[in-house]
């Protein structure tokens, strides 16, 4: 079992009327009369489907399977798990139009259908910071000097190139060493003499268990660490000599 971190922006419940309306439509945030004075309420995009800049790929089916591991998990500082400053109390799954998705309906679908039909999905969380116990920290969060960073465990992974997803064994059969250094490199897959995929080598996380989230200081250069989903990644210049060529036929040969 390995651990993974993913950063995103914190949105305070009080920030704007538009934010209140958008978030209130998909997740439970208390009204003024229901707020507890010793708590700072916030919401954030916890994780999104697709591939982030760490070359980790989140499938919709895996995010849905992990739904019951989100709520009641701790909020810590800089991933120091003993420094608990709050907790997550609600979650919602939304699409790219910020429409709330029914989790029971999602859970009833087969993995293939989920991965095809919900490729642009996000998990929103609502949480609280114990502001009377940590007043300085709460003020800094309110001033947007911190980001929220998702924490999760995963129990194994597959390897993805374009639309082709392979088990670790299959990836090894076609020449990919069991080495973290290959992730992020460009590869093309040849099958029966034809190119069937060409893209970055990515890690598809399996059996995810969300373990909470931390708040981390905003870096000096946010664009260098903001983790975007696959459909937002920029085009990069590629040296043809650096492309890894993989023979897909070796998988079939290895399975015979």
Show the residue positions of the predicted features.
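Signature of dsDNA virion morphogenesis modules
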Residues: 1-253
């Amino acid at each position: 079992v390995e651990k993974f971190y993913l950063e995103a922006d914190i949105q305070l419940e009080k920030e704007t009327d538009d934010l209140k309306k958008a978030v209130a439509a998909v997740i439970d945030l208390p009204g003024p009369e229901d707020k507890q004075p010793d708590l700072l309420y916030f919401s954030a995009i916890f994780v999104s489907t697709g591939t982030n800049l760490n070359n980790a790929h989140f499938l919709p089916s895996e995010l849905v399977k992990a739904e019951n591991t989100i709520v009641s998990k701790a909020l810590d500082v800089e991933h120091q798990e003993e420094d608990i400053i709050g907790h997550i109390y609600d979650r919602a799954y939304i699409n790219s139009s910020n429409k709330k998705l029914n989790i029971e309906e999602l859970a009833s679908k087969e993995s293939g259908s989920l991965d095809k039909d919900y490729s642009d999905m996000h998990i929103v969380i609502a949480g609280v910071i114990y502001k009377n116990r940590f007043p300085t920290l709460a003020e800094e969060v309110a001033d947007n000097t911190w980001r929220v960073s998702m924490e999760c465990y995963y129990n194994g992974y597959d390897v993805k190139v374009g639309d082709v997803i392979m088990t670790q064994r299959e990836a090894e059969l076609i020449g990919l060493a069991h080495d973290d250094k290959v992730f992020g490199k460009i590869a093309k897959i040849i099958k029966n003499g034809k190119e069937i995929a060409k893209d970055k080598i990515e890690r598809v996380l399996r059996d995810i268990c969300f373990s909470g989230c931390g708040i981390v200081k905003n870096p000096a250069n946010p664009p260098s660490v903001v983790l975007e989903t696959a459909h937002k990644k920029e085009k990069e210049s590629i040296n043809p000599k650096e492309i890894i060529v993989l023979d897909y036929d070796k998988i079939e040969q290895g399975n015979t």
